[in-house]
UniProtKB/Swiss-Prot annotation:
The keyword DNA-binding applies. PROSITE patterns: TOPO_IB_2. Gene3D superfamilies: DNA topoisomerase I domain (3.30.66.10), Topoisomerase I, Chain A, domain 3 (3.90.15.10). The gene is TOP1E. This is DNA topoisomerase 1B. SUPFAM superfamilies: DNA breaking-rejoining enzymes, DNA topoisomerase I domain. Residues 79-336 form the Topo IB-type catalytic domain. Belongs to the type IB topoisomerase family. It comes from Acanthamoeba polyphaga mimivirus. Releases the supercoiling and torsional tension of DNA introduced during the DNA replication and transcription by transiently cleaving and rejoining one strand of the DNA duplex. Introduces a single-strand break via transesterification at a target site in duplex DNA. The scissile phosphodiester is attacked by the catalytic tyrosine of the enzyme, resulting in the formation of a DNA-(3'-phosphotyrosyl)-enzyme intermediate and the expulsion of a 5'-OH DNA strand. The free DNA strand then undergoes passage around the unbroken strand thus removing DNA supercoils.
Length: 336
């Protein structure tokens, strides 16, 4: 097995005894408790598997690992983990990534509309969400907590300097956020929006049947409606942040793998920690938040237990590799 001694000591192994298996703890070679035997039996580990390792923690997402008769590494997963919220979120993420080209086609189309057209403003906002991983924000949070996202930004949050625009505002949990924008497309767009009356940044001009014009605000519902019309009814703007977190984590993990081959537990742990730090910087939160709420546990467990897979694909395109992992997740964990 490819795990170092420390990792092995955290688990359970088995030995053949007649026509059955006996399971032992690695750290003391004692037979496992009746409670652990009941859990292991529910995993239905095939008798033909060799090099079997079973998690000692009943809450571990990966409960057992072994090698099948064809030499392939196989897994058994925690049923509670499978049934949790992560199941639906990451099942949807694969389809979300596959649907991004449809959204991008719509945004290219709408970028050609007159500037203050509603869809053109929404297109600009979604491109910023994609590139800067901004939260959507809600007007109610802006009023109650003075916390903002892209749909609730005020003009007071914008600072225009030669060749650069800075957005500075309080985000979720009171965190101070600062975005430095040097892209001419975004700079030109924000400058145009600053010319409209009102304190809100993202607004558009609506014209009624009599030709009367009115300045309207773009809200989070408008953004979600645009996404659902152009990508699919199951998606929301929050999927962008899930996508961004997992893509950045994959990019960072592959980069760390190229720097340091994960051949032992210490290197694996360091590479994962650095990848979480890098992801947190991109999303402007902490590594703990990335791990708890955004990054797929399946990727983490896969890197810990099968680093050879990442070594083999360390030069892959990150999006293609993320799709490969998501496809594997849907097959291995969700049984699709």
């Amino acid at each position: 097995m490819s795990y170092d001694e420390k990792h092995l000591m955290e688990g359970i192994y088995r030995e053949k005894s007649g026509d059955k298996f006996i399971y032992y703890y690695f750290d003391n070679n004692e037979e496992v408790t009746t409670k652990d035997i009941e859990r292991i039996n529910k995993l239905r580990i095939p008798p033909a598997w060799t090099n079997v390792w079973v998690a000692r923690d009943p809450n571990s997402p990966i409960q057992a690992i072994g090698t099948d008769s064809k030499g392939r590494k196989q897994y058994r997963y925690n049923e509670i983990h499978i049934q949790g919220a992560e199941k639906e979120k990451f099942k949807r993420l694969y389809d979300f990534i596959k649907s991004i080209p449809k959204l991008e086609k719509a945004m290219v189309r709408d970028n050609n509309f007159p500037f203050y057209n509603k869809n053109r403003v929404i297109s600009l906002m979604l491109q910023m969400v994609r590139d800067y991983n901004m939260r959507v924000g809600k007007e109610v949070y802006a009023r109650q907590n003075k916390s903002y996202g892209i749909s609730s930004l005020r003009k007071k949050h914008v600072k225009i300097s030669p060749g650069v625009i800075t957005l500075n505002f309080k985000g979720k949990s009171g965190q101070r956020l600062n975005y430095t924008i040097r892209n001419d497309f975004y700079i030109d767009g924000i400058k145009m929006l600053m010319k409209l009356e009102g304190d809100r940044l993202f607004q558009y001009i609506s014209t009624d049947e009599d030709g009367n014009e009115k300045i309207m605000r773009v809200n989070d519902r408008d953004l979600n409606k645009y996404i659902q019309e152009n990508m699919g009814s199951e998606f929301t703007i929050k999927d962008f942040r899930t996508f961004g977190a997992n893509l950045y984590f994959i990019q960072a993990l592959l980069s760390e793998t190229r720097k340091r081959t994960p051949k032992n537990r210490k290197t694996i742990k360091k590479n994962i920690a650095n990848a979480f730090k890098s992801t947190a910087r991109q999303l402007k939160h902490t590594g703990a938040v990335s791990k708890k709420s955004y990054v797929m546990n399946y990727t983490l467990e896969l890197y810990q237990n099968n680093p050879e897979f990442f070594i083999e694909h360390k030069n892959d395109d990150p999006i293609d590799f993320l799709l490969r992992i998501l496809k594997s997740y849907r097959k291995d964990v969700l049984g699709e």
